[in-house]
Amino acid sequence: MKFSKKSEYGLRALLELTAHYGKALIQRQEISDRQNIPIEFLEQILLALKNAGLLASKRGISGGYSLIKPPDQITLGQVIRILDGPRAPISCVSKTAYQKCGDCPYADKTHCPIQGVMLDVRNAIADVLDNHKLSEFAKQMGGGSPDAGL
């Protein structure tokens, strides 16, 4: 399963925000420069994360971004679902975006031989992503504040 550049950049931006948690706001240009993220793309990512309730922002010369929640309360799964949408390998096993497989000969049956395996794949991916928090990555970077839950 491959994640998008949007998720990759979003996670890298959140590493910067995690390192600044409990400190001064960080400006998007600083995030862009430190993480080599194109500023136009970063603006879209930060807006999506803000709209999802993970970030706060302040406009103006002393403005910038900050995490609303502590980094030990934000999982990779949350971030990736916000930026990329559901991670199910096929739509008929998605928890959040379930769709019947329209062209599948088993769609109207009670059992699909593929669905069970794909459900296991979905659950394994979710288990990994939902059990790793931003604070773990900040710790590996040697960053983060004492309040970050490290």
Which residues are covered by each model-predicted region?
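Non-DNA-binding regulatory cores of transcription-related proteins
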Residues: I68-L150
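A short alpha-helical element within helix-turn-helix/winged-helix DNA-binding domains
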Residues: I26-N36
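Key DNA-contact positions within bacterial/archaeal DNA-binding proteins
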Residues: E40
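Beta-hairpin "wing" of winged helix-turn-helix
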Residues: G53-I68
